Amino acid sequence: MRKILSNCPVSCFADEISVSLDRQIQVLNELGIKFVEFRSADGTGVADFTDEQAKEAKKRLDAAGIRVSAVGSPIGKIGIEDDFEAHMKKLQRIERIADIFETPYIRMFSFYLPENADPKDYRDAVMKRMERMVQEAKASRLVLLDENE
C-alpha cells in the first residue's frame, strides 16, 4: 500500500488533525503527506488570515516540505439570496491568500437554497453568481474547484 501511495500525491485537510498548525505539520510529516488543502490553522479560518498570517503559515509549511494543493475556502457557503457583493470581496481576499500560498486552486461551494425550494427555480441565479466568480478567478489566473454539498 505504501509503495502505491508513494507514486500518488496525497493531499488532506490537516485542520481535521488538530487546530494547531505545528501539530498538523508534525502529523503530515509522520504520514509522509506533502500536500495540504489549507482551510484553517491556529483557530483562524483561511478567509480571515491576514497577509502576515498567511506568509507565516507558508514559511512553516515550506520549512517542513509541505505544499498547499488548494485553499479550502468557504466561498459559496452562503444562501443564494444573501449579500453577494460582500461575498465577492471575500473571494478577492482568498485570491490573495492563494497567491501567498503559491497555489492556483481555490475550493468553493455552490450556494445554499432556501429550505424546500425547487432547485430549478434558482438555477439561473446560481449560474449567474458562479459565472461571476469564475471570471474573477480567471482574471487572477486561479481555478475554482466546486464541491457539491
Predicted regions and their residues:
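Glycine-rich, proline-tolerant flexible connector loops at the mouths of alpha/beta enzymes
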Residues: 37-62, 110-117
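N-terminal G-site helix/loop of the GST-like fold
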Residues: 24-34
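Active-site acidic/histidine proton-transfer and metal-coordination neighborhood
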Residues: 20-26, 60-63, 79-149
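N-terminal carbohydrate-binding accessory modules
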Residues: 1-4, 27-29, 58
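Boundary/entry segment of secreted carbohydrate-active catalytic domains
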Residues: 2-21
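Aromatic-lined carbohydrate-binding surfaces of glycoside hydrolases
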Residues: 75
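Structural motif
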Residues: 31, 39, 100-101
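Structural preference for beta-strand elements that scaffold enzyme active sites
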Residues: 7-11, 35-37, 65-72, 103-107, ...
